[in-house]
Each structure stands twice: as structure tokens, then as C-alpha cells.
């Protein structure tokens, strides 16, 4: 007797999504890690440091999921060139006076987008 699998996406579509999630988590950990030395405010440095760890854990878990979906685990892929360009622009916030822009770009733009994508995936 066979049982239908739960979910609406094919294995390939799920692998692409997971690859996108991994890519963004990896980019976030690198971006936040790079900003720690550039950010003068100690509370913001500590926040970035904690979230570097969280992003690393998430990227690792997504990477472990990829082989289960018959996809290469060594790296993720951006969902689109436009989104990759947006993340590159955010990564470019390197000036010392851009701490507020850094916080807003990650916690009001990228993280909410990631949460919405995760919620859609689970629905």
C-alpha cells in the first residue's frame, strides 16, 4: 500500500528552495561577520555576533537537507540575479556611520523576507 507524500512542491522545487535558503543564510553570516569590526556601537556588535552563529547553524542545517533532496550540499544559489544584487548592495554598507542602515537592511528587509519565505514553504 502506498501513501501520498505531503506537500505541494516537487523534490526538485524543494531542493531549489532549500538551496536559496542556504545561500541567503550563508550570505547573512558573512555580511554580519564582516560588519562586526566596522560597527562602533557595542550592542549592535553583540547582536551581529549572535546572529552570525544563528545563520551559520541554519546554513549548516539547510546544507544537510540538500543531499536528502538529491542536490549538491556544498553551496546554495541565489533565487534571482535581482535578489543577489540587493544583497550585494546591503553588503556594501561599509562606512562607520551606516550602523542604522545595516540594522534596518538586515532586520527590516532580509530577515522578514526570509521568515515570509519559510512560512510560505511550510504552508
Where are the predicted features?
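Generic structural signal for well-ordered secondary structure
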Residues: 11-14, 25, 41, 48, ...
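Generic structural signal for well-ordered, non-transmembrane alpha-helical segments
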Residues: 19-26, 53-60, 105-116
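Intrinsic structural disorder
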Residues: 19-27, 31, 41, 61-67
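Conserved alpha-helical segments that form or flank metal/cofactor-binding pockets of metalloenzymes
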Residues: 46-90
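Acidic/His metal-coordination segments adjacent to aromatic residues that form catalytic metal sites
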Residues: 2-19, 78-109
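A structural signal for long alpha-helical coiled-coils and helix-turn connectors
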Residues: 33-37, 63, 70, 91-94, ...
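Helix-loop segments that flank and shape redox-cofactor active sites
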Residues: 27-50, 114-123
Amino acid at each position: 500500500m502506498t501513501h501520498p507524500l505531503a506537500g505541494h512542491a516537487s523534490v526538485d522545487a524543494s531542493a531549489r528552495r532549500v538551496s536559496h535558503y542556504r545561500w541567503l543564510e550563508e550570505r547573512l553570516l558573512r555580511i554580519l561577520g564582516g560588519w562586526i569590526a566596522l560597527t562602533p556601537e557595542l550592542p549592535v556588535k553583540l547582536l551581529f555576533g549572535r546572529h552570525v552563529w544563528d545563520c551559520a547553524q541554519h546554513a549548516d542545517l539547510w546544507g544537510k537537507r540538500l543531499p536528502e533532496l538529491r542536490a549538491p550540499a556544498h553551496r546554495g544559489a541565489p533565487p534571482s540575479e535581482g535578489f543577489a544584487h540587493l544583497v550585494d548592495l546591503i553588503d556594501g554598507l561599509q562606512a562607520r556611520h551606516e550602523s542604522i542602515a545595516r540594522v534596518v537592511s538586515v532586520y527590516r528587509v532580509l530577515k522578514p523576507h526570509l521568515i515570509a519565505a519559510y512560512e510560505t514553504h511550510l504552508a
